[in-house]
């Protein structure tokens, strides 16, 4: 399992939200590229970037900040938020991103995921955000009647690199991840699952490591590493030690 530091972008700045609410944001850094370098220095092996403005607008909104981040680090990067078509996927991959995340578009147009996986093999991730087990879209502003597990099963055989599962009710709340829901999703599909939302301590990471055998291969952490509740370097060392046996 790897620990994946997150950078959420709003109006060009690095912020964190509570439960995905845009009016409950805290600005942590005015220079996202420098923040990305810091996470790389602390041992981050993959950087998770979210274009929050893009997620709500349905189109890219922080391109200059994203480009600056990609140029600033050598580690792989993945981006989600406002990516709704093949043209945007290609543009971001051409920018230097390692892979892109389809969220709202994946729920509304699964065929886009299939097409993208064929055009860009190994570079497409699906983000499934859920509240009480139901998929939320449009920057979490809209909860659907589709169950997360049912949506994830749609993508079996498409060639999706990973599914990022976020429990919205836990995100930014520092209350611990939803281990049971994450494990259940991982057991239901053959696609690797990355856990997100609520990670607040090294103990939370250890608890997720305990379900790695179910197919949970990574954990995204945001607020905890910005507030100091988790030191990224310590979290990385913990998971590396486990990987090395």
Curated annotation (Swiss-Prot):
The Gene Ontology terms for molecular function here are: 1-(5-phosphoribosyl)-5-[(5-phosphoribosylamino)methylideneamino]imidazole-4-carboxamide isomerase activity
**What GO cellular component term, any one, is given?**
cytoplasm
Q: Please give the HAMAP family that the UniProt record associates with this protein.
A: HisA
Protein's UniProt name: 1-(5-phosphoribosyl)-5-[(5-phosphoribosylamino)methylideneamino] imidazole-4-carboxamide isomerase
UniProt lists the gene as hisA
| CDD domains, alphabetized | HisA (cd04732)
Identify one Pfam family in the record: His_biosynth
Question: So what EC number does this one have?
Answer: 5.3.1.16
Pathway entry: Amino-acid biosynthesis; L-histidine biosynthesis; L-histidine from 5-phospho-alpha-D-ribose 1-diphosphate: step 4/9
Q: Which InterPro entries has this protein been placed in?
A: Aldolase_TIM, His_biosynth, HisA_bact_arch, Isoase_HisA-like, Isoase_HisA-like_bact, RibuloseP-bd_barrel
